[in-house]
UniProtKB/Swiss-Prot annotation:
PANTHER family: DIPHTHAMIDE BIOSYNTHESIS PROTEIN 3, DPH3 HOMOLOG-RELATED. It comes from the Eukaryota. Its cofactor is Fe(2+). The DPH-type metal-binding (MB) domain can also bind zinc. However, iron is the physiological binding partner as zinc binding impairs the protein electron donor function. Fe cation binds at residues 25, 27, 47, 50. This is Diphthamide biosynthesis protein 3. It catalyses: [3Fe-4S](1+)-[protein] + Fe(2+)-[Dph3] = [3Fe-4S](0)-[protein] + Fe(3+)-[Dph3]; 2 [3Fe-4S](0)-[protein] + 2 Fe(2+)-[Dph3] + NADH = 2 [4Fe-4S](1+)-[protein] + 2 [Dph3] + NAD(+) + H(+). Component of the 2-(3-amino-3-carboxypropyl)histidine synthase complex composed of DPH1, DPH2, DPH3 and a NADH-dependent reductase, predominantly CBR1. Residues 3-59 form the DPH-type MB domain. Keywords: Cytoplasm, Iron, Metal-binding, Nucleus, Oxidoreductase.
């Protein structure tokens, strides 16, 4: 699969309400990928308006801060009652 570009997660915009990362596409729309898809190993963000895709460069550990920003418990964490 051919991608338009590689983009670091830090260069993307995260919306904590929708839990979606976005990045400007040359067509005028925005590439999109959800934080849950990224946690599940997906690293390709797609543009809903054209056929372009980008590869998002990140480590799974990078996602924890974004889950916290969205007031969500990161997957894989076990809540412990005290």
């Amino acid at each position: 699969m051919s991608t338009y570009d590689e983009v670091e997660i830090e260069d993307m915009t995260f919306d904590p309400d929708t839990q979606i990362f976005t990045y400007p596409c040359p067509c005028g729309d925005r590439f999109q990928i959800s934080i849950d898809d990224m946690y599940d190993g997906e690293d390709i963000a797609v543009c809903p308006s054209c056929s372009l895709m980008i590869q998002v460069v990140f480590d799974k550990e990078d996602l924890v801060e974004y889950y916290v920003e969205a007031n969500l418990e990161p997957p894989g964490k076990i809540a412990v009652a005290v």
